[in-house]
């Protein structure tokens, strides 16, 4: 069965302000525009994630919300996961392999370096660091999400706000 995983780095965020935690950093105006751009591209490609799994950082939640608004999807499609804020590849893998197998298109919004490392681990492609708002599309030929692992995915495309 064909499944798709969309790995996205949150869009451009503001620098940390005095007294503000890193987790509370918000999107810049450019980050908001870029999230809408990527959401519009997904919409024109008729890509509608069954689920958006996102970090609980303000900038990741905002990116996910803007994608959802642009795709005209229901907010219950967002699943917040605090462990994705400072995640390792292992953490992402654990969360993805526990997904319901009724989901065929899953979008994860996270942070570098883990989101970039995960894309390279799953595809064995040299992708490099995802820029803010960057999105990697990975295709799997699997019946169960628990079957994903090193090199099990096929790199389909890298999308950035500058390329759409």
Model regions: which residues?
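Short, well-ordered alpha-helical microsegments
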Residues: 60-61, 89, 115-116
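Short phosphate-binding loop-to-helix
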Residues: 84-100
């Amino acid at each position: 069965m064909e499944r798709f995983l969309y790995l996205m780095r949150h869009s451009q965020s503001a620098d940390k302000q005095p007294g503000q935690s890193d987790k509370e950093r918000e999107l810049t105006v450019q980050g908001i525009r870029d999230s809408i751009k990527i959401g519009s591209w997904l919409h024109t490609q008729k890509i509608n994630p069954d689920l958006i799994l996102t970090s609980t950082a303000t900038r990741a939640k905002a990116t996910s919300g803007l994608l959802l608004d642009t795709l005209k999807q229901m907010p219950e499609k967002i699943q917040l996961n605090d462990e994705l804020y400072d995640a390792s590849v292992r953490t992402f893998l654990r969360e993805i392999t526990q997904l319901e197998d009724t989901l065929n298109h899953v979008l994860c919004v996270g942070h570098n370096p883990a989101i970039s490392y995960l894309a390279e681990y799953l595809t064995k492609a040299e992708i490099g660091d995802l820029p803010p708002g960057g999105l990697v599309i990975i295709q799997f030929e699997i019946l169960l999400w628990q079957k994903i692992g090193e090199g099990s995915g096929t790199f389909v495309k890298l999308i950035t706000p500058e390329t759409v």
